[in-house]
UniProtKB/Swiss-Prot annotation:
The gene is MT-CYB. It comes from Antidorcas marsupialis (Springbok). Heme b b566 binds at H97, H196. It comes from the Eukaryota. Keywords: Electron transport, Heme, Iron, Membrane, Metal-binding, Mitochondrion, Mitochondrion inner membrane, Respiratory chain, Transmembrane, Transmembrane helix, Transport, Ubiquinone. Belongs to the cytochrome b family. One of its GO terms (molecular function) is metal ion binding. The chain crosses the membrane at residues 33-53, 77-98, 113-133, 178-198, 226-246, 288-308, 320-340, 347-367. GO terms for cellular component: mitochondrial inner membrane; respiratory chain complex III. This is Cytochrome b. Disulfide bonds: none annotated.
Length: 379
């Protein structure tokens, strides 16, 4: 009798995606982050669902309801902190996953890559709206500052901002709709992740060499299932260390003060995972220019396949490109640091130089390094 997992209409989909899937024999731990992102998403949906059972999306009670979750709900504190720090783990995995794609040339899978960029935007939108929900000072002012950026759009800007707000400022209507969107978006992300996986399985996985691995494939189960379980255990260990020992390490103390439209915090800043983009936004004195730079800082990923000038796919055997890649990583860390600093000397000029270097590296220096690499190998 043929195995049921290979014949059953539902089980064979799972089988072809996670069990009998032919996988390259040499993919490293950098390939673990896709499955870790899936785990993060499931964890966020589950903890978020339990939080939504006790949360009220109303300006008068939102802050109190979060306090109630932490004080009165059974294990509410751990659910709340798992959700908040789970977002940080999500973005660590996301940035690593994208970095892996850049380093090993995975962006040559065009559809997979483009769906991935859409996933990144959707996740960033979800995280931003989630940060508004506790209705603390940084929630309110973060929402005000970021939504206000849309007013830089010529002609329709002001109307667009007021339409998103549902009034003339960030208020009850804004909070209610942000909760609605924050609830629905993770399910859209889950659907997009399935599309992402669908396109990936059309081509099969890339591998560190960037060479076709069709000649040497192994089944996903048990080899990569056990490897993914190890990754998942390490992820959960890191998350729980964060949650149980320093749950507020990555948060902002200002968010423990209820939102007050009459009192602006001295330094408005987003969560750490948006600081690099925030630094790029602030480094341009012009409002519209800053908004465009902010969007382009992420949208530039779409251009990666067009900017690939090397004859090799992966950076594994390209020392010059590797050097540029790690300079880019260092630059992003610098931007993250600058985004959390006040707007004063010397942080302004450092932020501007780091922003220029960011775009220069991706648009000019990395393609040039690839071309020089080709010429050195007489290609």
């Amino acid at each position: 009798m043929i195995n049921m997992r290979k014949t059953h209409p539902l089980m064979k989909i799972v089988n072809n995606a996670f069990i009998d899937l032919p996988a390259p024999s040499n993919i490293s731990s950098w390939w673990n982050f896709g499955s870790l992102l899936g785990i993060c998403l499931i964890l966020q949906i589950l903890t978020g669902l339990f939080l939504a059972m006790h949360y009220t999306a109303d300006t008068a009670t939102a802050f109190s309801s979060v306090t109630h979750i932490c004080r009165d709900v059974n294990y509410g504190w751990i659910i709340r902190y798992m959700h908040a720090n789970g977002a940080s783990m999500f973005f660590i995995c996301l940035f690593t996953h994208v970095g892996r794609g850049l380093y090993y040339g995975s962006y040559t899978f065009l559809e997979t890559w483009n769906v991935g960029v859409i996933l990144l935007f959707a996740t960033m939108a979800t995280a931003f709206m989630g940060y508004v929900l506790p209705w603390g000072q940084m929630s309110f002012w973060g929402a005000t500052v970021i939504t206000n950026l849309l007013s830089a759009i010529p002609y329709i800007g002001t109307n667009l901002v007021e339409w998103i707000w549902g009034g003339f400022s960030v208020d009850k209507a804004t909070l209610t709709r942000f909760f609605a969107f924050h609830f629905i978006l993770p399910f859209i992300i889950a659907a997009l992740a399935m599309v992402h996986l669908l396109f990936l399985h059309e081509t099969g996985s890339n591998n560190p060499t960037g060479i076709s691995s069709d000649a040497d494939k192994i089944p996903f189960h048990p080899y990569y299932t056990i490897k993914d379980i190890l990754g998942a255990l390490l992820l959960i260990l890191t998350l729980m260390l964060l949650v149980l020992f320093s749950p507020d390490l990555l948060g902002d103390p200002d968010n423990y003060t209820p939102a007050n439209p009459l009192n602006t915090p001295p330094h408005i800043k987003p969560e750490w995972y948006f600081l690099f983009a925030y630094a790029i936004l602030r480094s341009i004195p012009n409002k519209l220019g800053g908004v465009l730079a902010l969007i382009m800082s992420i949208l530039i990923l779409v251009l990666m396949p067009l900017l690939h000038t090397s004859k090799q796919r992966s950076m594994l055997f390209r020392p010059m490109s590797q050097c540029m890649f790690w300079i880019l990583v260092a630059d992003l860390l610098t931007l993250t640091w600058i985004g959390g600093q006040p707007v004063e000397h010397p942080f302004i000029i450092i932020g501007q130089l780091a922003s220029i270097l960011y775009f220069l590296l991706i648009l000019v220096l990395m393609p040039v390094a690839s071309t020089i690499g080709n010429n050195l190998l007489k290609w």
